[in-house]
Amino acid sequence: VTAYGGLPGGVALSHLCVYDWPAADGLRGGTPHLHLACSEAYVVTGGRGAVQTLTASGYEVTPLAPGTVAWFTPGTVHRLIDEGGLRITVLMQNGGLPEAGDAVLTLPPEYLADPRAYAAATTIPADAPEEEQARIARARRDLALEGYHALREAPEGLAAFHRAAAALVRPRIDAWRARWRRGALAAAEATGEQLDRLARGDAGHLADAVVRSEQPSQHGRFGMCGRLDVYPQG
């Protein structure tokens, strides 16, 4: 019997307070980036803002207000804009993958071509003072905006960015696959086995029901889009 005890569907959940730092274009918000194997959903719980997205189909702006649910698939370059106290509960497909590196910032091409340069520009040391973490988070946001605006102005470069992002994360794929097997795949396989049992008239798995709860493992962590309250991931 497949064992799975995580959140429904293998998703990850976090609570996000979007950065209100102004950028060079006069907008306040987070760091543009994409995910390569995970869809992401926003459940807006407070404030107002928008998410700018860039895909092969073009550029869009989706307004965000309390009650809005917005989501996008892998390959979507996204930038959150804060227009006043924007707070979001984030649902991420394949819980654990983004924490394991399934996120590439839209840095200028020379950083994407050099894994060491990319890591140096994007890593926030966990043991650094809060002021230093904030400085690094803001600096990498501004650097990513340089690459993002270049893609906005010349969207034909998006395919090259996709290729560079895929090359950057390729060494991590085996680790991602292991996390996916423990999480989302295990959740789906458990459902399949439950359906097989029910089709045979076997309700035995219902006696194995459990209840779980957790509190955030970190509060106010500096993320790509803002400060995060996060939960343990597999």
Labelled PLM ranges:
Residues 15-35:
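Conserved short histidine dyad/triad with adjacent acidic residue
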Residues 32-34, 39-44, 61-62, 70, ...:
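His/acidic/aromatic-lined binding-pocket segments of jelly-roll/cupin-type domains
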Residues 36-51, 91-93:
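Short, conserved beta-strand element in jelly-roll/cupin
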Residues 54-75:
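Short acidic-glycine-tyrosine-enriched beta hairpin
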Residues 64-66, 77, 81-89, 94-104, ...:
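Acidic/histidine-enriched, beta-strand-rich ligand/metal-binding domains
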Residues 85-158:
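Double-stranded beta-helix
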Residues 125-203:
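An accessory alpha-helical subdomain
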Residues 207-234:
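Charge-dense, extended regions
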